[in-house]
Regions:
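Compositionally biased terminal segments of proteins
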Residues: 1-204
Protein backbone atom coordinates (compact mmCIF):
# COMPACT_ATOMS: atom_id res chain seq x y z
CA UNK A 1 0.00 0.00 0.00
CA UNK A 2 1.47 3.34 -1.06
CA UNK A 3 2.02 5.84 1.73
CA UNK A 4 0.47 9.30 1.38
CA UNK A 5 2.91 12.10 0.64
CA UNK A 6 1.04 14.65 2.76
CA UNK A 7 -0.84 14.90 6.04
CA UNK A 8 -4.14 15.11 4.16
CA UNK A 9 -3.67 11.57 2.87
CA UNK A 10 -4.47 10.13 6.28
CA UNK A 11 -7.70 10.08 8.26
CA UNK A 12 -8.34 9.78 11.98
CA UNK A 13 -11.05 7.19 11.35
CA UNK A 14 -8.63 4.95 9.46
CA UNK A 15 -6.05 5.27 12.23
CA UNK A 16 -8.66 4.34 14.83
CA UNK A 17 -9.48 1.25 12.76
CA UNK A 18 -5.79 0.31 12.88
CA UNK A 19 -6.00 0.69 16.64
CA UNK A 20 -9.00 -1.65 16.64
CA UNK A 21 -7.01 -4.23 14.69
CA UNK A 22 -4.21 -4.10 17.24
CA UNK A 23 -6.47 -4.40 20.28
CA UNK A 24 -8.53 -7.21 18.71
CA UNK A 25 -5.36 -9.13 17.84
CA UNK A 26 -3.92 -8.83 21.34
CA UNK A 27 -7.26 -9.76 22.87
CA UNK A 28 -7.11 -13.20 21.30
CA UNK A 29 -3.45 -14.05 21.85
CA UNK A 30 -3.64 -14.87 25.55
CA UNK A 31 -0.17 -15.05 27.17
CA UNK A 32 1.51 -14.66 23.77
CA UNK A 33 0.43 -11.01 23.59
CA UNK A 34 3.49 -10.20 25.69
CA UNK A 35 5.66 -11.28 22.74
CA UNK A 36 4.13 -8.69 20.38
CA UNK A 37 5.54 -5.17 20.02
CA UNK A 38 4.09 -2.32 17.98
CA UNK A 39 6.39 -0.37 15.67
CA UNK A 40 5.70 1.77 12.61
CA UNK A 41 3.31 4.62 11.93
CA UNK A 42 0.80 3.97 14.71
CA UNK A 43 3.48 4.27 17.41
CA UNK A 44 3.78 8.11 17.63
CA UNK A 45 0.15 8.17 18.77
CA UNK A 46 1.37 6.72 22.08
CA UNK A 47 4.82 8.28 22.31
CA UNK A 48 3.38 11.78 22.66
CA UNK A 49 0.92 12.01 25.55
CA UNK A 50 -0.19 15.57 24.77
CA UNK A 51 -3.04 16.10 22.33
CA UNK A 52 -4.14 19.02 20.10
CA UNK A 53 -4.15 21.95 20.41
CA UNK A 54 -1.11 21.57 22.69
CA UNK A 55 0.74 19.65 19.97
CA UNK A 56 0.00 19.02 16.28
CA UNK A 57 -2.32 16.09 15.61
CA UNK A 58 -0.84 12.68 14.84
CA UNK A 59 -1.06 12.34 11.06
CA UNK A 60 -2.14 8.73 11.25
CA UNK A 61 -1.24 5.45 9.57
CA UNK A 62 -2.59 2.99 7.02
CA UNK A 63 -1.31 -0.25 8.54
CA UNK A 64 -0.25 -2.03 11.72
CA UNK A 65 3.37 -3.17 11.99
CA UNK A 66 4.28 -5.52 14.83
CA UNK A 67 7.56 -7.17 15.77
CA UNK A 68 6.98 -10.66 17.11
CA UNK A 69 9.21 -12.93 19.16
CA UNK A 70 10.38 -15.83 16.99
CA UNK A 71 8.95 -18.21 19.59
CA UNK A 72 5.48 -17.40 18.28
CA UNK A 73 6.48 -18.94 14.95
CA UNK A 74 8.35 -21.93 16.39
CA UNK A 75 6.09 -22.89 19.30
CA UNK A 76 3.21 -25.02 18.02
CA UNK A 77 0.62 -23.68 20.48
CA UNK A 78 1.62 -20.08 19.89
CA UNK A 79 1.59 -20.50 16.12
CA UNK A 80 -1.88 -22.04 16.09
CA UNK A 81 -3.17 -19.37 18.48
CA UNK A 82 -1.97 -16.65 16.11
CA UNK A 83 -3.33 -18.49 13.08
CA UNK A 84 -6.77 -19.02 14.65
CA UNK A 85 -6.92 -15.43 15.83
CA UNK A 86 -6.18 -14.07 12.35
CA UNK A 87 -8.91 -16.28 10.90
CA UNK A 88 -11.44 -15.14 13.51
CA UNK A 89 -10.63 -11.53 12.63
CA UNK A 90 -11.31 -12.28 8.97
CA UNK A 91 -7.71 -11.80 7.88
CA UNK A 92 -6.33 -13.36 4.72
CA UNK A 93 -2.90 -13.29 3.15
CA UNK A 94 -2.22 -10.17 1.12
CA UNK A 95 -0.70 -10.29 -2.35
CA UNK A 96 2.31 -8.50 -3.78
CA UNK A 97 2.47 -6.80 -7.18
CA UNK A 98 3.04 -10.19 -8.83
CA UNK A 99 -0.16 -11.55 -7.26
CA UNK A 100 1.84 -13.85 -4.98
CA UNK A 101 0.37 -14.45 -1.53
CA UNK A 102 2.54 -13.22 1.32
CA UNK A 103 2.96 -15.04 4.62
CA UNK A 104 3.96 -11.91 6.57
CA UNK A 105 1.40 -9.38 5.31
CA UNK A 106 -2.28 -9.95 6.09
CA UNK A 107 -5.42 -7.98 5.30
CA UNK A 108 -9.07 -7.71 6.23
CA UNK A 109 -11.88 -5.18 5.91
CA UNK A 110 -13.81 -3.47 8.66
CA UNK A 111 -17.60 -3.35 8.87
CA UNK A 112 -17.56 -0.14 6.81
CA UNK A 113 -15.21 -1.52 4.14
CA UNK A 114 -11.86 -0.02 5.16
CA UNK A 115 -8.92 -2.21 4.13
CA UNK A 116 -6.71 -3.05 7.11
CA UNK A 117 -3.13 -4.24 6.66
CA UNK A 118 -1.19 -6.15 9.33
CA UNK A 119 2.53 -6.78 8.86
CA UNK A 120 4.42 -9.34 10.95
CA UNK A 121 8.09 -8.50 11.46
CA UNK A 122 10.92 -10.33 13.23
CA UNK A 123 14.68 -10.24 13.76
CA UNK A 124 16.35 -13.53 12.81
CA UNK A 125 20.02 -12.90 11.94
CA UNK A 126 20.88 -16.60 12.24
CA UNK A 127 18.32 -17.39 9.52
CA UNK A 128 18.32 -14.40 7.20
CA UNK A 129 21.47 -12.57 8.22
CA UNK A 130 21.25 -8.84 7.59
CA UNK A 131 18.83 -9.11 4.70
CA UNK A 132 15.28 -7.79 4.65
CA UNK A 133 13.43 -10.86 3.42
CA UNK A 134 10.55 -13.18 4.39
CA UNK A 135 11.50 -15.93 6.81
CA UNK A 136 10.96 -19.49 5.57
CA UNK A 137 7.82 -21.26 6.77
CA UNK A 138 6.08 -24.59 6.28
CA UNK A 139 2.71 -23.05 7.10
CA UNK A 140 0.79 -19.97 6.06
CA UNK A 141 2.22 -17.53 8.60
CA UNK A 142 5.73 -16.14 8.73
CA UNK A 143 7.41 -12.79 9.31
CA UNK A 144 9.55 -10.35 7.36
CA UNK A 145 13.09 -10.30 8.68
CA UNK A 146 13.97 -6.75 9.74
CA UNK A 147 17.55 -6.58 11.05
CA UNK A 148 17.85 -5.03 14.51
CA UNK A 149 14.08 -4.89 15.04
CA UNK A 150 14.52 -6.91 18.24
CA UNK A 151 15.85 -3.78 19.96
CA UNK A 152 12.21 -3.05 20.69
CA UNK A 153 12.21 -6.00 23.13
CA UNK A 154 14.43 -3.92 25.42
CA UNK A 155 13.53 -0.38 24.39
CA UNK A 156 9.75 -0.14 24.72
CA UNK A 157 6.91 1.49 26.60
CA UNK A 158 3.54 0.11 27.67
CA UNK A 159 0.33 2.03 26.97
CA UNK A 160 -3.23 0.99 27.80
CA UNK A 161 -5.46 1.31 24.75
CA UNK A 162 -9.24 1.04 24.68
CA UNK A 163 -10.89 0.32 21.34
CA UNK A 164 -13.95 -1.23 19.77
CA UNK A 165 -13.21 -4.81 18.76
CA UNK A 166 -13.58 -5.85 15.13
CA UNK A 167 -16.77 -7.73 14.34
CA UNK A 168 -18.91 -5.61 16.68
CA UNK A 169 -17.73 -7.63 19.68
CA UNK A 170 -17.77 -4.82 22.19
CA UNK A 171 -15.05 -2.63 23.64
CA UNK A 172 -11.82 -3.88 25.20
CA UNK A 173 -8.74 -2.46 26.85
CA UNK A 174 -5.30 -3.95 26.23
CA UNK A 175 -1.79 -3.10 27.38
CA UNK A 176 0.22 -2.48 24.23
CA UNK A 177 3.99 -2.82 24.18
CA UNK A 178 5.36 -0.36 21.65
CA UNK A 179 8.67 1.10 20.58
CA UNK A 180 9.94 3.95 22.71
CA UNK A 181 11.45 7.08 21.21
CA UNK A 182 14.93 5.55 20.91
CA UNK A 183 13.95 2.28 19.21
CA UNK A 184 11.33 3.99 17.04
CA UNK A 185 13.86 6.49 15.73
CA UNK A 186 16.52 3.83 15.18
CA UNK A 187 14.18 1.54 13.25
CA UNK A 188 12.86 4.37 11.09
CA UNK A 189 16.41 5.50 10.33
CA UNK A 190 17.36 1.96 9.37
CA UNK A 191 14.32 1.63 7.11
CA UNK A 192 15.16 4.87 5.34
CA UNK A 193 18.85 4.05 4.97
CA UNK A 194 18.78 0.35 4.14
CA UNK A 195 15.45 -0.15 2.39
CA UNK A 196 14.84 3.29 0.88
CA UNK A 197 11.43 2.99 2.49
CA UNK A 198 9.17 5.95 2.00
CA UNK A 199 8.38 7.40 5.41
CA UNK A 200 4.96 8.54 6.53
CA UNK A 201 4.26 12.22 5.98
CA UNK A 202 4.78 13.07 9.66
CA UNK A 203 8.13 11.25 9.91
CA UNK A 204 10.16 13.37 7.53
Amino acid sequence: MAKPATFDGYSDEYTKDCERVLVTLLRGLGPWKESVYLVGGLTPRYLVAARPPVVPAHAGTLDVDIVIDLQILTDTDAYHTLEENLKKMGFERAENDQKQKLSWRWQTRTEHGALMILELLADAPEIAGGKVQPLPTEGTISALNIPHSSIVFDLYQVTEIQAELLGENGVATEKVRHANLVSFTCLKSFAFDQRNERLNAFET
